[in-house]
Amino acid sequence: MVTIRLARGGAKKRPFYNIVVADSRNARDGRFIERVGFFNPVARGQEEALRLDLDRVDHWVANGAATTDRVAKLIKDARKAAA
């Protein structure tokens, strides 16, 4: 099953997440099909905290990709900010 989920990066105690489309059988930070954005939970000041390619997210969801709970919330926030 294809899922849209967070893949952790960054340093210890400084998380940074790539939002990726991946097969659910692959490891969290392993192989993925496409990177559709990023999420920086510790962004400060003018740093960009969230970027999502909503066209690609819509494409994958239309083709049956499931989203995790956290990614669904991030998509909702991105749509709200874009409107």
UniProtKB/Swiss-Prot annotation:
* BP GO terms, sorted: translation
User: What are the record keywords, sorted?
Assistant: Ribonucleoprotein, Ribosomal protein
- Molecular function terms, GO-annotated: structural constituent of ribosome
Gene3D superfamilies (UniProt xref): 3.30.1320.10
Which GO CC terms are listed, alphabetically?
A: cytoplasm; small ribosomal subunit
Q: List the disulfide bonds.
A: none
Which InterPro entries does UniProt cross-reference here?
Ribosomal_bS16, Ribosomal_bS16_CS, Ribosomal_bS16_dom_sf
Q: What PROSITE patterns does the database record attribute to this sequence?
A: RIBOSOMAL_S16 (PS00732)
**What Pfam families would the database entry show?**
Ribosomal_S16
Annotated PANTHER family: 30S RIBOSOMAL PROTEIN S16, SMALL RIBOSOMAL SUBUNIT PROTEIN BS16M
Query: Which family is it part of?
Result: Belongs to the bacterial ribosomal protein bS16 family.
Stated name of the protein: Small ribosomal subunit protein bS16
Write down the species.
Answer: Shewanella loihica (strain ATCC BAA-1088 / PV-4)
